[in-house]
């Protein structure tokens, strides 16, 4: 078992950029710059490259057991101690599987998998459903599903590939929402510091509820819950813009720099500061590999010629 969900299609439906060759950076209205990684040539004003090469996301997570014991899954000794427990999952390279856990585990046993900033992790639940947890996210789940339903609890962002079982429906609780799932692939983004909770459906069907309000999603549609107004709405979206992260890509479509760097800071575990307030609103479109070093991302952004970066460890100052 490796640390990437098996059988998922690669990003294919975004037509605006060539994944192999071109990144378009937009600032303001009507201006832009193209970069060809194959040749290393910029068409437009050439930027000055500064900063270090910082690593991309790592397969790192903390597992909290039912008795409160915390296991750092990077720690070999901790993993060995975990393997001796009755409810022990199988620990692979960047992945955790509960398929082999026996039914003798206590009914009330719940575990929590927490992925820190700069990390990501794959979880295979006892029923074979697969979850890819993004950085700064956590999922609480039963070690064994014994009830007439399968229910997990999410904070942050995750991509789900749920095993179909009509006799035992699958639910994801994301405060204050409940998402009911059939055999389905979909993503949920529910970071506490963000106003919107996004449920993006790739295949199958889901039902999203907030109290008495509920919406049904078909593929390529997204449920948007606004925490500030408690309203629930549905829109048609290009799912790749919201789910490309599971395939190891960073895609932003005409987004403010502040939003882009907040997301990248979460992926690379960086603290972002701004020496000039106006640069927060500069708009960019980016399509790059998520696991490139951060230095490569800086090169692309600096190539626009209107911003620079000062790097000190994991602290980035935007100038």
Q: Which sequence ranges carry the predicted segments?
A:
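A residue-level detector for the "anchor" residue at the start of short, highly conserved motifs
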Residues: 13-20, 30-319
């Amino acid at each position: 078992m490796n640390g990437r969900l098996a059988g998922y299609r690669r990003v294919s439906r975004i037509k605006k950029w060539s994944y192999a060759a071109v990144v378009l950076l937009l600032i303001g209205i009507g201006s832009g710059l193209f970069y060809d990684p194959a040749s290393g040539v910029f068409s437009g004003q050439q930027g000055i490259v500064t900063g270090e090469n910082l690593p991309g996301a790592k397969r790192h997570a903390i597992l909290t057991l039912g008795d409160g014991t915390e296991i750092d899954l990077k720690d070999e000794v901790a993993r060995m101690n975990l393997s001796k427990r009755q409810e022990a999952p199988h620990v692979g390279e960047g992945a955790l599987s509960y398929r082999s856990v026996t039914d003798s585990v206590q009914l009330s046993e719940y575990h929590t998998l927490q992925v820190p900033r700069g990390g990501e992790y794959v979880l295979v639940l006892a029923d074979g459903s697969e979850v890819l947890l993004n950085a700064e996210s956590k999922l609480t789940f039963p070690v064994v599903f014994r009830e007439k339903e399968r229910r997990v609890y999410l904070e942050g962002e995750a991509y789900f590939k749920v095993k179909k079982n009509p006799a035992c429906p699958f639910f994801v609780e994301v405060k204050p929402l409940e998402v009911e799932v059939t055999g389905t692939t979909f993503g949920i983004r529910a970071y506490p510091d963000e106003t919107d909770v996004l449920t993006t459906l790739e295949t199958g069907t889901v039902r999203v509820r907030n109290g008495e309000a509920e919406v049904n999603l078909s593929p390529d549609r997204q449920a948007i819950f606004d925490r500030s107004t408690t309203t629930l709405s549905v829109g048609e979206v290009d799912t790749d813009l919201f789910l490309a992260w599971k395939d190891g890509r960073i895609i932003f479509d005409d987004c403010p720099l502040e939003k882009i760097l907040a997301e990248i800071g979460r992926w690379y575990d960086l603290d972002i500061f701004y020496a000039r307030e106006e640069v927060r609103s500069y708009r960019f479109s980016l399509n790059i590999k998520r696991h490139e070093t951060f230095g490569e991302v800086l090169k692309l952004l600096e190539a626009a010629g209107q911003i620079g970066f000062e790097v000190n460890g994991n602290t980035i100052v935007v100038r």
